[in-house]
Design a protein with these regions (language model features):
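Non-catalytic all-alpha helical scaffold/repeat segments
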Residues: 1-504
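Non-globular sequence segments
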Residues: 494-507, 512-513, 562-565
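Short amphipathic alpha-helical heptad-repeat segments
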Residues: 514-526
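Short, charged/polar, low-complexity loop and linker segments
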Residues: 526-532
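The canonical alpha-helical register within tetratricopeptide repeats
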Residues: 528, 545-546, 553
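Short, charged, amphipathic alpha-helical segments
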Residues: 539-549
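Amphipathic alpha-helical coiled-coil segments
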Residues: 550-564
Length: 565
């Protein structure tokens, strides 16, 4: 054990020798130094303090703030197994104070650390009883920041320089800290100008203005004009304008901006803020503006947000116009908004043949974003009439006797096939019911369409796939009576094969259990077939075959399980 410890110590010394004035290397050393005994720590810390004197202030403060954070972390999680003793932490604190920066402003930068890991030297430990530990530490953070800023002002240090360094070091809440603690929630033109000058990206400026604007004590229009006079940052300008809660479209800040700003504004993936007191015409104006300047996603997001503020007819009209938007940017939430809008429109217009057809066309347009079960109007159209389904067949499959492949048709078929394969429905089904007359009419028309397309050989295979999605019959067995009659009338080997395959595929993912579940399915399908065999022999034959398939599969799974043992 002694030899192993000696190796660790020598390795640490080797790392220290190679660290020189590299802050990153010293930070890595600090992460493991607590594992060594006191004399070794003292030796390493003394070397660290010496090397820090040779560093520039930027490097010094990185090391110093790392030590500060380790003190905070260990005192906060005081009961954790990996925690340092208070004796070691006091040593850390002592050594931290020995690291002196030439420009004292650097010592104030830690006040811009995030709320959730603000490096208090003496936080309330997480082990304390009570649920308000976070709130109490937040209060301590506020006191710390206020005290440090008071000291900063008393010593006459430059606020402009503090802002410059904080932005340079990429602290993320600079604007918020200045607004809340330095300006006490009030607008300070000098601070704003300094933030604009030092932060080219504009995030700190936005955070500063946003915090004060939320308190309602800033003239946003005046600030926007001031930013325009100082900066050419259009992104910052757009973000600031986005803070406005609009209640009057004529006087809205965005209304008077140029085309570029409007495009950036309406393409932002943030919810438009319209006052609850705004008149109906404000929402109508916003729809037009978003349609003209926004993206596919932001337009959908906006329609979703105001769906309760406009009539269903207006929502319907606005949704139909989405196909005119050229900016087709989408994100992970686009399908959520789309589904929410369609849920409303489908509920109101699914019985209106004209509007249902238009919505079905739009559902087809969005087929890459909507799941089949969400395309209720398209389902109704295809269940009521086979024309569209047949047209898809003509795109995907070759004509009888045709070997030539048209390249344009092949590319179109590739785009359509995956969706076509998801279209699972029973023709003419409505609310779980199917009538023989309607189903036969659909089947006959579909066969005639296939014949006219020179694809009649596909009839049995396609019909078998669709009929497998029949609802349950009045007697509690599958398929329903109307489908049984159609199977008896149009039965072919291809219909049987496709029906069996589709029915088995409906099972989906399942747990392997040595054939037990397959045996249960075998019995269930056998019982179903026995009930049908006298009156519907062809239909029963289909279910007997499914039963036999599961019986074979059950034996196979049982054998596999036994072989594993």
């Amino acid at each position: 054990m002694y030899e192993i410890n000696k190796i660790y110590i020598e390795y640490l010394r080797m790392c220290v020798d190679k660290a020189h004035t590299d802050a990153d290397r010293w930070i890595k050393i600090l992460q493991c130094i607590n594992r060594y005994e006191g004399s070794i720590r003292k030796e390493i810390f003394e070397e660290l303090v010496i090397k820090c004197k040779e560093m520039n202030d930027e490097e010094k403060i990185r090391v110093k703030n790392k030590i500060r954070y380790e003190i905070f972390r260990n005192r906060y999680f005081v009961d954790e197994d990996w925690g340092m003793s208070e004796e070691i932490l006091c040593e850390y604190e002592c050594r931290m104070n020995e690291i002196i920066v030439d420009e004292k402003i650097y010592d104030f930068l830690y006040i811009f650390s995030h709320k959730y890991d603000f490096p208090l030297l003496n936080p309330i430990p997480n082990s304390k009883e009570g649920t308000d530990i976070h709130d109490k530490n937040y209060i301590l953070r506020e006191k710390e920041i206020k005290a440090r800023l008071k000291e900063f002002n008393e010593k006459g240090y430059s606020i402009d320089r503090l802002i410059q360094l904080a932005v340079q070091e990429k602290y993320e809440i600079v604007g918020e800290v200045f607004a809340q603690f330095y300006c006490n929630g009030s607008f300070n033109e000098k601070v704003l100008c300094s933030l604009i000058k030092n932060d080219e990206e504009g995030k700190s400026v936005y955070d500063y203005v946003s915090y004060i604007y939320r308190n309602g004590i800033i003239d946003l229009r005046k600030v926007v004009e001031q930013v325009k006079s100082i900066s050419e940052n259009k992104n910052l300008l757009t973000n600031l304008i986005s803070l406005e809660i609009i209640d009057d479209c004529e006087n809205a800040l965005i209304a008077s901006e140029d085309e570029d700003i409007k495009k950036m504004y309406w393409s932002k993936s943030v919810r438009l803020k319209i006052s609850d007191k705004a008149e109906h015409r404000v929402f109508v104006w916003a729809i037009r503006e978003c349609q003209k300047y926004g993206s596919f996603h932001t337009y959908l997001e906006f329609l979703y947000e105001i769906k309760d503020k406009i009539s269903v007819q207006e929502l319907y009209k606005a949704t139909l116009e989405i196909s005119d938007i050229k900016n087709n940017v989408v994100n992970s939430m686009t399908d959520y908004y789309l589904k929410g809008i369609f849920d409303i429109l489908q509920k109101y217009f699914i019985e209106d043949d004209k509007k249902c057809t238009e919505l079905a066309t739009l559902e087809w347009f969005f087929r890459e974003l909507l799941e089949w079960e969400n395309m209720k109007c398209m389902q109704k159209i295809m269940k009521d009439d086979p024309t569209f389904y047949a047209s898809l067949v003509s795109i995907i499959y070759k004509m009888d006797g045709c070997e030539a492949v048209d390249e344009a048709k092949r590319k179109l078929a590739d785009k359509v096939y995956s969706w076509f394969n998801e279209a699972k429905f029973c023709p003419t089904e409505k609310n779980g019911k199917v009538t023989y007359e309607n189903l036969k009419r659909w089947i006959e028309k579909f066969r005639n369409l296939l014949t006219s397309q020179k694809q009649e050989k596909l009839f049995g295979n396609l019909i078998g796939c669709l009929l497998a999605y029949s609802p349950i019959g009045e007697d509690g067995y599958s398929p329903c009576e109307a489908v049984r009659m159609i199977i008896e009338e149009y039965y072919t080997d291809s219909l049987k094969t496709s029906y069996v395959m589709e029915e088995e595929n409906k099972r989906g993912i399942h747990i392997v259990d040595a054939g037990k579940s397959e045996l249960i399915l075998c019995q269930r399908y056998k019982e179903n077939a026995e009930v049908l065999q006298e009156q519907y022999p062809y239909t029963a034959e289909i279910y007997f075959e499914i039963s036999d398939n599961y019986k074979c599969e059950s034996k196979y799974e049982r054998k596999c399980a036994e072989d594993e043992w």
